[in-house]
Amino acid sequence: MKKYIVSIGVDISDNDVKTNPKVNELVNKEIKKRLSKLGIKATISNITGDDIVITSFVPENLIEKNNKIIFEVLNKYAEGFDDLRGISEDKDKAGEGLSYAIAESISEYGDAIIIAFDTYGGESFVDEMALFVKEIGEKFGYDVGCSVSNEPIEIPGIGYTGAESDDPVVVITVEELDDIPKLAGLIYGGLLSFDKLYFVKNGDEVNILPPGVIYTMTAFLNGNVIDLYGGIRRKIKF
């Protein structure tokens, strides 16, 4: 059976610049506990400004169940509900909601790179950045999932999220570990061409000159998460 990497990005904070570590801990703990019983490896992979991304390595037949459980947990612990309330069973009523990206796993262990963006006044140009990352992955033959869409996206087990969802997520699955540094370097280098975009550590708050966008880049490896910021910084020496 095919397996997939599913990433769900959401703002459940009560502010626009950072997340609550205690809430993140509760969400992560319950998601891991509930999904591990189904044989799904899942964790918070990215924390970018006031957004978190939950990433799962999941068999095709459990995608709907995976998403439903994550949505339940998010609603249980959320401090802010705007993104959650943007979800609708009616496609035409879906508003700004979750960011949803899915890509087929080509590795036995579900290895992937997850890139997450958060905006502070950069809503008008952040989609271009995410689509640029998507294009890099596709150009080099990787399977890519991207949350950017011109119309509402159906999230199995949850409902529809609107096209106006503005903190995109990109998932790129890889076959070999050696693909990680090559792909990460290409993405980092390519994104340097964008003004008002800042590469930050996983977990960083929005500490920029607005308007602008921050992004994190992580490796999701067999359910484990590595923040690629440190490795890229040491290699590039910025």
UniProtKB/Swiss-Prot annotation:
To M.thermoautotrophicum MTH564. InterPro entries: UCP005278. This is Uncharacterized protein MJ1676.
